[in-house]
Amino acid sequence: MSKGNEEGQAIPPEGQDGERAQEKRLSRGKFIAAAGAAGAGLVAAGAPAAMAKSWSKGSRNKALTANQHAPGMIGGPTGFPGAARYQYPANSEEGRAVLAARALRKAGKAPDTLVVQALNFARPQFENKFPAGATASIAGIWERETGIKLKFVETNPASEYATNIRNASTKNGSFDLVTGAIEDTGDYAEAGLLRPLDDYVHKYRPSWNDPKYGYAGGKPTVQLFTQYNGRTYWVAFDNDTQPYVYRSDLFNNPREKAAFENKYGQPLTVPKTWDDQAKIAEFFNRPKASTPLYGSVERKCPFWGIVNWEHRFLCSADPNMFYFKPDGSANVNNTAGIRAAEEHLRSLGWSEPGALSKDWLAQYQLFGAGNGVQGGTFPNVTKLIQPANKTLDKGFGKYLKTDVQPGRMVNGKLVRRTVIFYIISYGVNAFAPKSHHEAAYLFLQWAGGARMYTYLTANPGGYQDPHHTISFNDPLVIQEYQPQPVRALKEIIPRSAPGITIRGAPQYNQALDQELQKMLTKQQSPEQAMKNTERRWNQITKRLGTERQAKAIRASYAAFPTKGRYGPNSPIK
């Protein structure tokens, strides 16, 4: 990042600082602010009062109906009410990217087409027009503004890792942009598949650390979402910070509240600690009721279940309990690891029949049918379980609220940690033609910029979730995810921690997963599960090179929440 300007800012116009100054300059008679969406139940929201005053009746109607950009904006979507919210000036992360890509194309230094590897459920958000009236999709806007086409090649979560490890070994340069999860970062970087992006980040200054346009949670979130071993490899296109979901109608029922307090001697409220969570799970677990209730429906199945051990483990120290010690050795065969395993096992008793083989979709079905009381899951739970989606919502989606995962009291402080699980990311394929690299990065900065990415995540066509601060005030995002869960995300992201992202992450995760599954199927005790995990993790580290792994482990600590990020101490309203 350049010195003398805030990170993510261009050279300040008229002696002012960055993108916020640019907005102020344009708003004085030139900038047409974000319009509230009309039509399908949307209301005006999120536009600063000073900008709203700049509307005249004529200019407002013109901007809302014409297929053109608002004054001062050089690009972005058009054709629908509120499109100006996602348009951008030249002095913005999107503006810098699109102007640079256009210049590269004109100079013959960019390809005719960028080939983008994308997950099957992410691709539609790039290619589907949204909302009604939009003149182009995300891909169409990019081509219109730069002259560079996009070609998508699909993969899926089940095969993406193996495919890309094979791409690395064969040095496959037939595609320009790599997709993956942050758990894959270490392996992809060490295999040479991902090109480090720091030179482009320095040159084009994305606004990731900007207080207004940046990632919610600031610098630790940026490091968590984009970096490995101190270098930038990804641009984040997702937010799989796991919220804690609960049935608000049950928690607010006067009869249930009175019965709970009578039994446990404390009020029924959203659990702040894992001890609270266990009491609530026990209380509401009613498998033989006319509508069966299961008290704790976070996942226990292979792959999807390990995150629920991680939530419990990480909150055992202030500010975090780490998976590995600074010397690279495993840090799980201890009180924190064993307790997390014991709680994970105990929770199985409050789960639905067959829980050991049921994934997140089965969990969504439980919530939608009114059978699930509480449990951690993905942010799009309230986006998908809505009345319009009769496949999932059987009348209970309206009661689903979210909060930060429960935690523990540590030295008088309430430590609550949510773990990022998966998160779709994109990087530049190091084996693609070098002449494609810069344009490939510029597409990521543009599509992953605060304005354009907010627009992308509001599109109901896919599962890429919001993580920029401004996204949480956007009417279309709020409409899709629901108001309370969007407010909760603002609190969840700053308290989010990574899973294992160093080289060999899939091997470490598989070892933990297998030992937890043996425990859940009563083949071994929680103590033995952690002892075996420690042994296997240390073997993996030794095989990959202890000194090298330890260096990456120490660097990874910067991606965890910092000291002082406690609570919240009351439910998020």
Language-model region placement:
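Short helix-initiation/N-cap motifs at beta->coil->alpha
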Residues: 154-164, 272-276, 355-369
